């Protein structure tokens, strides 16, 4: 706004008469919370383009609508290294925007709704994330991973599939750090329901998982062609194979 800023600076509690481009210093008994607005006013309300700066260094610069953050803008809080650039509505992140934590490298780039991740977006996790996650890219609902998305870990593991309220849930494909792949059903972040484990050595096993454990009758198909049945109970294998030479079992497997 530069030279267009009025020379008049307000210090009292009333902004009723402010019009056009003005500077207003908000009164406070605590200097720590002092804030200054420089920008456009309409009928005593911040409206148009303007900058609000707090004593602690926090700054909002962008569009206003009747005293609320609304439209395109940026918010920077230097004490914590947080910076947001994007759309606002009713003083909240709303629409498309990027939120960055500069101190640890965390960043969300995508859609927002009332201050929460909502829609499609990519979250890059902290450099020192305790769960060793690198990123999640996909759908969100009210701040949680929800819908279809991909998550990757530093170990090389990756999950691609459905999520519900932040957890793997429904149909999905998990690639493990050793190269094995599991395709099947998930519930509450655990393998639960029909699935197939593709081992890196070429072997395959088809069956049902319960609470992340193999449970029930499995078909184990070796890479060289031999097929046998195996019985698991809560992840524990029966001592002996149930049968060998199960060539009559269809090799076609479809997991919905």
Regions found by a protein language model. Give the residues of each.
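Intrinsically disordered, low-complexity repeat tracts enriched in Gly/Pro/Ser/Thr and acidic residues
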Residues: 1-256
């Amino acid at each position: 706004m530069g030279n267009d800023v009025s020379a008049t600076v307000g210090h009292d509690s009333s902004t009723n008469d402010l019009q056009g481009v003005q500077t207003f210093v908000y009164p406070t008994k605590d200097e720590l919370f002092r804030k200054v607005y420089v920008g456009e006013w309409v009928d005593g309300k911040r409206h148009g383009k303007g900058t609000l700066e707090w004593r602690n260094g926090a700054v909002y610069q962008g569009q206003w609508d009747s005293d609320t953050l609304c439209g395109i803008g940026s918010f920077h809080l230097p004490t914590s290294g947080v910076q947001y650039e994007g759309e606002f509505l009713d003083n909240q992140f709303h629409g498309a925007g990027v939120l960055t934590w500069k101190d640890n490298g965390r960043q969300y780039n995508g859609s927002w709704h009332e201050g929460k991740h909502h829609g499609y977006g990519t979250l890059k996790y902290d450099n020192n994330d305790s769960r060793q996650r690198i990123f999640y890219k996909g759908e969100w609902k009210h701040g949680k991973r929800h819908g279809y998305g991909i998550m990757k870990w530093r170990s090389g593991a990756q999950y691609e599939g459905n999520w519900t309220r932040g957890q793997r849930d429904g149909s999905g494909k998990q690639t493990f750090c050793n190269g094995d792949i599991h395709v099947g059903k998930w519930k509450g972040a655990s393998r639960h329901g029909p699935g197939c484990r593709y081992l890196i050595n070429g072997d395959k096993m088809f069956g049902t998982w319960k609470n992340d454990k193999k449970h029930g009758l499995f078909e184990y198909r070796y890479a060289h062609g031999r097929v046998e049945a195996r019985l698991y109970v809560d992840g524990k294998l029966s001592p002996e194979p149930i049968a060998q030479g199960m060539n009559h079992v269809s090799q076609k497997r479809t997991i919905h």
